[in-house]
Amino acid sequence: MGEQVIVLTDLTKQYGNFTAVDHIRLNIRKGEIFGLLGPNGAGKSTTILMMLGLTEPTSGTVEICGINSTTHPIEVKRRIGYLPEDVGFYDDMTGPENLIYTARLNGISDKEAKTKALELMKRVGLEDQLAKKTGKYSRGMRQRLGLADVLIKNPEIIILDEPTSGIDPAGVQEFIELLR
């Protein structure tokens, strides 16, 4: 396998006397697929937020592609595609319009953004929903669009936080197939 792209060293997060994350050590190499498993409240989402540079650890370090996420969170965010548990889109915009907006925020030209948006809508099985406003999308459709939103900036690392939550069993199977 390749170089280490995610390195957590003694990562800890405390809220007062409560320890949400307790000295995690983790190394993930390029090309690996890794899952954080545990019950509700185990610190999975908190760990992800620290990896993204959105929450500062109490102690320990996070390096993403060799960059410290606490001291350089914007640079880390440029390299990561993140799909949160509850995906948010502009409900009055179509799927492609939301994707193009994300692409523009990431410095992708209008021409390339439009091309990639249409390609990704097809890839995630939403090619027949091009004119539909995302406010009318089902939960499964929003998750699919969320995956397209993650992929449009061609990230080095993809982090998914409970990507199949609230999706019916058939939809879960379809979503897993999209990830392959």
Across the structure, where does each feature detected by a protein language model lie?
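Conserved ABC transporter NBD signature motif
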Residues: 60-68, 75-76
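Conserved catalytic motifs of ABC-family nucleotide-binding domains
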Residues: 154
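Conserved ABC ATPase "signature" region
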Residues: 100, 104, 111-129, 177
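Helical segment within the ABC ATPase nucleotide-binding domain
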Residues: 173-180
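Conserved ABC ATPase signature
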Residues: 133-137
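Catalytic Walker B motif of ABC-type/P-loop ATPase nucleotide-binding domains
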Residues: 158-161
